[in-house]
Amino acid sequence: MTARRARLTAVGWETDLVIESAADDPSPPAGSEIRVAVEACGICYRDIIDRDGRFPFIRIPITPGHEAAGRVIALGPDAKDFRVGDRVASMHREFCGHCRACASGSPSLCEFGASLFGLTIDGGYASELVAPERAFYALPATLPAPEAAILHCTFGTAYRGLARLGELRSGGSVLVTGANGGVGNAAVQVAKRLGAEVIAVVRNEKHVPHLMRLGADRVIVDAGAGFHKQIAQPVDVALDCVGPPTFNSALRSVRSGGTVVVVGNVAADRPQLNLGYVVTRGVRICGSAGAARHDMAELLQLHAKSPLSIR
């Protein structure tokens, strides 16, 4: 069957994606590259802002999509991590694998400018995807492709933010803003499986029943930025999945010596930061995006023990 791909030929919503045929006789993967037959590719908020043209470095034309899952169908001569037939999912980006950040397990901070699927290199809206093997991680045979495709972007982001940067442990407590979104839903579930007390924050009460089913111990409905006033006991970690509108209240929700992990930045405005409050309370503020291979391996172990609702 002829391979096909979607192409974005201009940013903005006036131009439709173009479906075109790829080469009938594609060149074999080079070096450590692998060729993956794509079984599913997710659509998330970043795909929307990619198409909006909010990233000036986007390469046009390009094949969008950074949440791909599928099966390895060909290997480059230097590929060692996978075999033909293995199930894999993409890591959002291609990175060098050798710099200090990559070597320390933080490939999203690659010092040599990681290439981004769907922005600077062709992504997963295609029959096949070719990239270095380090841009993929292994999947279990039992995880359906549609769930596997979105696992890294939502649950991987939540897991790394909570377990790695937030150092959330059993018996701890966490507050999640934007809990009704994809990463927020994932964070509620991940935090609960890590043994934490979970407070979710949303703007609309219609989300309350669903979040309680996912494991939230309490859901605060607050359309403003004063939800910290509704918390009796400051939390160990706040995972801010929104950005400027919720940041300051999230900051004031954590205990002295606690951590605010920022994974959301959906608003263009800038938060007002009281540095004196940060200094005197000893609060850590971390930014995080995506996850590393070892994060995904741990997350998949967590899922095997207590299945997550991935959707």
What are the residue ranges of the model-derived segments?
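Short N-terminal strand-loop motif that marks the start
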Residues: 1-69, 131, 219
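N-terminal Rossmann-fold cofactor-binding loop
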Residues: 201-205, 222-223, 241, 264, ...
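A short acidic, Gly/Pro-enriched loop at the edge of an enzyme's catalytic core
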Residues: 229-238
